[in-house]
């Protein structure tokens, strides 16, 4: 039973170094605490579509790993501060001679005003590791954001379960926490820092995925196109049965975002999709 039940944890740990370009980040310094909240108008329908590519530059065993990502998000302003955001994503990752495909989606229902946003989310992800078995991961949780003139602080916590199809006795608990900051140098130049923790637990096995990511975003003045690039550090640890295995991965990534319904990078966040995907980066 231990060998069978550990399969879902092993499967997660063996395919989780695919690069992702979600925009989250941790706390900023106390010098920003005296800024006043920014006023904003109703947003209507605002969204974006983005594509990115990432490659591991340092990984356990020097594994040759890279991934490309296609993602989209749209926000619907229902009036009176209530909003609905929908996310969809696809990732294709390569590890040596193995190709994996993952699909994910999320639905966010929340309230937003000039000072803060708060709500709930549900999400699902499906991983096809190319070995005839698919892994499904479902999660729900709460999220919140706080707006000032030149920065946004946001975070989320969630709980869900991961399972392997055709193996009814394999279910891992999935715990997630994230904290992020978006810092605006101008309305079209933003720097993001994000941190997240995912824990998968089943029986006596725990799989922890800790990540920190730095991202620079620049939106062109003449066109609704944003260029972004950054660095992501990931630490993975598989523990249990009186032993543990861990490894670190460094990833460089870059991409393009095509926006609609907004005129600046800052307006896109304040009136459009404010939440990042909380998925496990397979």
List where the protein language model places each region.
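Repeated loop/turn-to-beta-strand initiation elements of outer-membrane beta-barrel proteins
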Residues: 79-86, 113-120, 150-155, 187-193, ...
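Detector for outer-membrane/organellar transmembrane beta-barrel domains
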Residues: 135-202, 209-213
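Residues that define the transmembrane beta-barrel architecture of outer-membrane proteins
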Residues: 43-45, 64-70, 99-105, 114, ...
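Sequence/structural signature of outer-membrane beta-barrel proteins
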Residues: 54-60, 89-97, 116, 123-133, ...
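Short glycine/proline- and aromatic-enriched beta-strand/turn motifs that initiate or cap beta-hairpins
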Residues: 21-94, 282
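Transmembrane beta-barrel strands of outer-membrane/channel proteins
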Residues: 49-55, 86-90, 107, 120-124, ...
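Residues on the lipid-exposed face of transmembrane beta-strands in outer-membrane beta-barrel proteins
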Residues: 70-76, 107-111, 142-146, 179-183, ...
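Flexible, glycine-rich linker and terminal segments associated
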Residues: 22-30, 202, 226, 239, ...
């Amino acid at each position: 039973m231990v060998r069978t039940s550990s399969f879902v944890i092993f499967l997660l740990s063996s395919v989780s170094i695919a690069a992702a370009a979600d925009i989250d980040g941790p706390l900023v310094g106390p010098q920003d605490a005296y800024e006043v909240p920014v006023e904003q108008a109703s947003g209507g329908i605002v969204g974006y579509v983005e594509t990115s590519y990432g490659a591991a530059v340092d990984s356990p065993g020097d594994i040759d790993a890279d991934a490309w990502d296609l993602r989209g998000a749209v926000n619907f302003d229902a009036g009176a501060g209530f909003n609905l955001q929908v996310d969809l994503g696809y990732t294709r990752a390569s590890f040596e001679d193995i190709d994996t495909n993952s699909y994910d989606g999320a639905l966010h229902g929340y309230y937003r005003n000039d000072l803060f946003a708060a709500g709930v989310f549900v999400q699902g992800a499906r991983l096809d590791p190319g070995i005839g078995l698919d892994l499904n991961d479902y999660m729900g949780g709460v999220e919140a954001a706080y707006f000032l003139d030149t920065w946004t602080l946001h975070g989320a916590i969630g709980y869900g379960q991961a399972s392997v199809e055709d193996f009814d006795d394999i279910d891992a608990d999935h715990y997630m926490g994230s904290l992020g900051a978006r810092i605006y140098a101008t309305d079209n130049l933003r720097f993001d820092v994000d941190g997240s923790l995912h824990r998968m637990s089943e029986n006596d096995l725990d799989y922890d995925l800790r990540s920190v990511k730095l991202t620079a975003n620049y939106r062109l003045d003449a066109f609704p196109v944003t260029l972004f690039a950054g660095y992501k550090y990931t630490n993975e640890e598989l523990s249990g049965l009186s032993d543990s295995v861990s490894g670190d991965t460094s990833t460089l990534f870059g991409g393009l975002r095509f926006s609609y319904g907004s005129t600046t990078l800052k307006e896109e966040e304040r009136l459009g999709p404010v939440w990042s995907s909380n998925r496990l980066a397979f």
